[in-house]
Amino acid sequence: MPNWKRLWVNTGVLTGAGVLTMVVLKALPADATAWNKREDAKVPMFKRWWRNVRKGPVWDGDNPIFNYVLHPYAGAAYYMGARSQGFSTWGSFVYCFCISTFFWEYGFEAFNEIPSVQDLIVTPVVGSLLGEAFYVAKRHIVANDYRILGSRVLGTACAWLLDPINETIGAFRGDQKHQLQRNRMRRGEGLSGSSWIAPSTNGLQGGVSLVYNF
């Protein structure tokens, strides 16, 4: 069942991450982002946003690393933000599309550049395809107690790379610990017990039995 409450939390985290990303991009050299910082500073912020929105979308000349590596990865992270919370592939794609289009391309980024044709297509489409592959891979990692090649450190790191939003929030909520407990219960591992009460000549007798399965 889709977890709408957690999806809103994820969206809030994405908003904070978007602000942080803009700060980092602003600090990069102009040739890394193709933003004309000197000219942008001459135009009021919201006037600049409206100007860019009216002119777009256009085919951009951004660094291919941004367009064809980082944007698909960002799209996969958006997709996983919904998919890992019980949403279908279609619902997760819609969420990815909305975040990449309205939150980013016509949102934060439009304050600095005209919306991009490549980003409007590559981020949600390629990102969702990549995201579904991430989802399948992460499910295998989680089912294996967050281990890869026997290493929980490696498994946890890979899970975070595949699903950074949910894993970051989950680190504060203790989600991994709870998942490991659920895995042990499904396998019949851990401590289990039972109690009993029976009549006797002196009244009632009772007892408790404990079993630990390895």
Give, region by region, the residue ranges found by the protein language model.
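Transmembrane beta-barrel domains of Gram-negative outer membranes and organellar outer membranes
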Residues: 2-8, 17-67, 84, 89, ...
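Short acidic alpha-helical/loop segments enriched in Asp/Glu that coordinate divalent cations
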Residues: 33-36, 93, 143-145
